[in-house]
Swiss-Prot record:
Pfam families: Transferrin. It comes from Bos taurus. Residues 25-351, 364-689 form the Transferrin-like domain. This is Serotransferrin. Its main location: secreted. GO terms for biological process: antibacterial humoral response; intracellular iron ion homeostasis; iron ion transport. The gene is TF. Residues 1-19 form the signal peptide.
Length: 704
């Protein structure tokens, strides 16, 4: 055989000679069996994808070595469990999950399960009362049965930094923890039902091993609590009547029905995920490769090569139990993918010293957007005596993400962002009240405010029905009065999301910079580069900014009913506003008529929910306590706060809170949907297909 022919055949076998390096995914393997499956994967991909993407194989000795290899650009991808996804995301690795394995069907893919604590209904202890109880676990080192509950209980365990097993043995009166060190910690195996060498075995030889085994330990009365996953009760008790005998222990030390696992769980445990470099990580090529691969080699496909089978081992390259792949949204870093509870659990288990007792103290880290809010927040922090600290982000979605991750604790949001925050797992804590005063204010949340479309009185021909090709001014994309309500109404008329083509030009901070909806924006007076950003660096941002846009450039402004009044007749002394009269402006009615701005009650687009403070569920009680004290010290009820600090006043407009806030009122039911109301949630759900929110896409990735 001639050398040239021999070389071409070798290239065909290797699948590398003509492969474009940018279209080649270097898959990292950790064993000979994985390397062999990877080689088969490579050859079969070459057979079906002549133009790529291609696969090459890199062999290392451990997943941690693979993480380092990818970080150093010596490999491109590897599949990891949640704990290793966490390690991969930490500095200096800086990797991110790009593709998730899912279980179930394409129509209802599941990328996580809930770790729960199950108890019998006829008992009355809570999660913070488990000391001295008898516990049932799936197995040592397993997520739902060991890692999550031990992390949740970490601060209560005696000397956990010495040995988690010893700490657990001293915390519970007796346990069944299959796979535990029975000779060193006999109490961890005391409840197990296996005989002889099978007692506490790391397999089904121990009757109380695994999810069903741990639940059996509880059912048979051996234990008081079982740490399992949310589906375990349903799998073992198909009769709903039998399930009524059991309850879940919630993180807030309450109990709920086993049906309410989405509201009462210890942590959400994510599926295995493929990780890649955050920068230059080939995430689109990796997805293209795996998407093609699952179409040809996935579950129930006729090809001899199967992605989710491991003939010479178990879970080689991918989990054998996986049913397919889903692309992870680009905004989703490792912390958002894993979730706050799971990340906190992993952090606790990795503590090398006792938990800092100061973490138990109630203080609030407020998230400020941009320089002006940070300046006010720092001043607030100084007057608060340490109760308030400050964190900064460039925009609202970054702040929401920081609160989700525990990098910040709270902020006040309008209804549109509150919807996004709610979808991201945050809860409303206190509502801003704008009209109620006196003693009843803090106990009576208001119904909401009016969203209006404002025009100049001199533009007499403009009405709600002829806004096409007009110049529009918005508070920001995804905000209630400035975007969600008017664009939701507009969508119902034009049946598409091309709002940038409907208006001739506009300023809607948060829009793509090349959009016509950024054309009117003017940015910061301190220099260029801040045009159309959704924070106070854009002078047309927010209620006052959108109204200023109308005064200086636009035809219509979408704001709240009080905006015109607050910026006319001497109420705003800035140069652009000081000579304005409210009579110079009117509001548009949906029936095509117009009315004075003082008659907005009879001429508005819709009623929007008042702004509200949001936080994580675990921090909500602390936030409410601190803010009630802060408004007592610096709120509107204080006779003269100007010599110190005024919580509801700003040097510019609406920094941290709306300036017209009278008080922060307690909310009876702290869920985003009950606070926003059915009509508003329905409108937001309809408008979601027009949403450009990357954070909302990330937060809704894990389906309920």
């Amino acid at each position: 055989m001639r050398p040239a022919v021999r070389a071409l055949l070798a290239c065909a076998v290797l699948g590398l000679c003509l492969a474009d390096p940018e279209r080649t995914v270097r898959w990292c393997t950790i064993s000979t069996h994985e390397a062999n499956k990877c080689a088969s994967f490579r050859e079969n991909v070459l057979r079906i994808l002549e133009s790529g993407p291609f696969v090459s194989c890199v062999k290392k000795t451990s997943h941690m070595d693979c993480i380092k290899a990818i970080s150093n650009n010596e490999a491109d991808a590897v599949t990891l469990d949640g704990g290793l996804v966490y390690e991969a995301g930490l500095k200096p690795n800086n990797l991110k999950p790009v593709v998730a394995e899912f279980h179930g069907t394409k129509d209802n893919p599941q990328t996580h399960y809930y770790a729960v604590a199950v108890v019998k209904k006829d008992t009355d202890f809570k999660l913070n009362e488990l000391r001295g109880k008898k516990s049932c676990h799936t197995g040592l080192g397993r997520s739902a049965g060991w890692n999550i509950p031990m992390a949740k209980l970490y601060k209560e365990l005696p000397d956990p930094q010495e040995s988690i097993q010893r700490a657990a043995a001293n915390f519970f009166s007796a346990s069944c923890v299959p796979c535990a060190d029975q000779s060193s910690f006999p109490k961890l195996c005391q409840l197990c039902a296996g005989k002889g060498t099978d007692k506490c075995a790391c397999s089904n030889h121990e009757p109380y091993f695994g999810y069903s085994g741990a639940f059996k330990c509880l059912m048979e009365g051996a234990g008081d609590v079982a740490f399992v996953k949310h589906s375990t009760v349903f799998d073992n008790l198909p009769n709903p009547e039998d399930r009524k005998n059991y309850e879940l222990l919630c993180g807030d030390n309450t109990r709920k029905s086993v049906d309410d696992y989405q509201e009462c769980y210890l942590a959400m445990v994510p599926s295995h995920a493929v990780v890649a470099r955050t920068v230059g990580g080939k995430e689109d090529v990796i997805w293209e490769l795996l998407n093609h691969a699952q179409e040809h080699f996935g579950k129930d496909k006729p090809d001899n090569f199967q992605l989710f089978q491991s003939p010479h081992g178990k879970d080689l390259l991918f989990k054998d139990s996986a049913d397919g792949f889903l692309k992870i949204p680009s905004k989703m870093d490792f912390e958002l993918y894993l979730g706050y509870e799971y990340v906190t659990a992993l952090q606790n288990l990795r503590e090398s010293k006792p938990p800092d007792s100061s973490k138990d103290e109630c203080m609030v880290k407020w998230c400020a957007i941009g320089h002006q809010e940070r300046t006010k927040c720092d001043r607030w922090s100084g007057f608060s005596g340490g109760a308030i600290e400050c964190e900064t982000a460039e925009n609202t979605e970054e702040c929401i993400a920081k609160i989700m991750k525990g990098e910040a604790d709270a902020m006040s949001l309008d209804g549109g962002y509150l919807y996004i925050a709610g979808k991201c797992g945050l809860v409303p804590v206190l509502a801003e009240n704008y009209k109620t005063e006196g003693e009843s204010c803090k106990n009576t949340p208001e119904k909401g405010y009016l969203a209006v479309a404002v025009v100049k009185t001199s533009d007499a021909n403009i009405n709600w029905n002829n806004l096409k090709d007009k110049k529009s001014c918005h508070t920001a994309v995804d905000r209630t009065a400035g975007w969600n309500i008017p664009m939701g109404l507009l969508y119902s008329k034009i049946n598409n999301c091309k709002f940038d083509e409907f208006f001739s030009a506009g300023c809607a901070p948060g829009s793509p910079r090349n959009s016509s909806l950024c054309a009117l924006c003017i940015g910061s007076e301190k220099g260029t580069g801040k045009e159309c950003v959704p924070n106070s660096n854009e002078r047309y941002y927010g209620y006052t900014g959108a109204f200023r846009c109308l005064v200086e450039k636009g035809d219509v402004a979408f704001v709240k009913d009080q905006t015109v009044i607050q910026n006319t007749d001497g109420n705003n002394n800035e140069a652009w506003a000081k000579n304005l009269k409210k009579e110079n402006f009117e509001v548009l009615c949906k029936d095509g008529t117009r009315k004075p701005v003082t008659d907005a009650e009879n001429c508005h687009l819709a009623r929007g929910p008042n702004h509200a403070v949001v936080s994580r569920k675990d921090k909500a009680t602390c936030v409410e306590k601190i803010l009630n004290k802060q408004q007592d010290d610096f709120g509107k009820s204080v006779t003269d706060c100007t010599s110190n600090f005024c919580l509801f006043q700003s040097n510019s407009k609406d920094l941290l809170f709306r300036d017209d806030t009278k008080c922060l009122a307690s909310i009876a039911k702290k869920t985003y949907d009950s606070y926003l109301g059915d009509d508003y949630v329905r409108a937001m759900t309809n408008l979601r297909q027009c949403s450009t929110s990357k954070l909302l896409e990330a937060c809704t990735f894990h389906k309920p």
